[in-house]
A protein has these predicted regions:
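Catalytic machinery of carbohydrate-active enzymes
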Residues: 1-265
Length: 265
């Protein structure tokens, strides 16, 4: 570890925190202190990820801010207050960045790090008590055989980058963390229609880890939860489907074990 501090700029969407987790951990070992930015809505998950690393400092944006780049006023404030620091950036902090397919590898290229370093940092800080509490509440309604499904539908806010809705045909109850999956279906007599409650919503997506690991099936779009999946133990999940046109196997080799469902074609 050297005596320099590091301001590390990377994209702030929820999934980016998992994509860039290895880079933060790497820099945490190299620098005396590492300063990263976080959207207000992601604060609980990001704080949990790094709470065991005293030299990782998280700067949280205003509650109304929802851009994937850190606010310039906070960046400038950091630069003026932190002595002996370097600024390291990835993504669109460089206006020439190529955000086409495979952008995740280019994030690491910008940092002069091999993308394979991600496989060296696959441990994340989990809160078993919170996970089990949420799991028990949900399976108390849905039962122990259920589908975990996630796309960009959310009753709390509208995502700025909407993905096509994910639909499945199954007799198993479908749990969506951010909306009643059955609320948009015409048949309100569906036996699973009234299982969901907004009380099952958590402001920390890490709370769903146990629920995901114990699900019968997983169906997700390329989103924050798909970025979380490589960190979980999914060996007992009978079916895993991701709905995307991206080359997700290059994102993480674990997706070789998934059904990759093309969308919009």
């Amino acid at each position: 570890m050297n005596d320099e501090n590091c301001i590390f700029l990377f994209h702030l969407s929820t999934g980016d925190n998992f994509t860039m987790y290895a880079a933060v951990r790497h820099f945490q070992k190299l620098y005396r202190n590492v300063y990263i930015f976080c959207l207000h809505r992601n604060r609980r998950a990001v704080i949990q990820l790094y709470e065991t690393y005293a030299n990782v400092h998280i700067i949280i944006s205003d509650e109304t801010y929802n851009n994937f780049l850190a606010p310039s006023n906070l960046i400038n404030q950091c630069k003026s207050q932190i002595k002996n620091c370097v600024v390291v950036a990835s993504g669109y902090y460089d206006s020439t960045f190529d955000g086409s397919t495979g952008f995740w590898e280019r994030f690491y290229t910008q940092l002069c790090l091999p993308y394979r370093i991600r496989y060296q940092y696959e441990d994340i800080n989990r809160n078993n008590e919170r996970e089990l509490s949420l799991y028990n509440s949900i399976v108390g309604m849905f039962g122990k055989n259920y589908i975990f499904l996630h796309d960009h539908r959310n009753i709390a806010y509208t995502h700025y980058d909407i993905r096509p809705n994910v639909r499945v045909k199954s007799d198993l109850p479908v749990f969506h963390p951010n909306i009643n999956y059955y609320s948009e279906l015409e048949n309100e007599t569906n036996p699973h229609h009234d299982l969901w409650s907004s009380e099952f919503m958590s402001d920390n997506l890490l709370d769903y880890c146990t629920l995901i690991e114990n699900s019968t099936e997983i169906h997700v779009s390329d989103s924050s939860f798909s970025c979380l999946m490589p960190f979980l133990d999914l060996k007992n999940v009978k079916r895993k489907c991701i709905y995307t046109n991206l080359d997700v196997v290059s994102y993480h080799s674990e997706f070789k074990n998934w059904e990759i469902m093309a969308v919009g074609v």
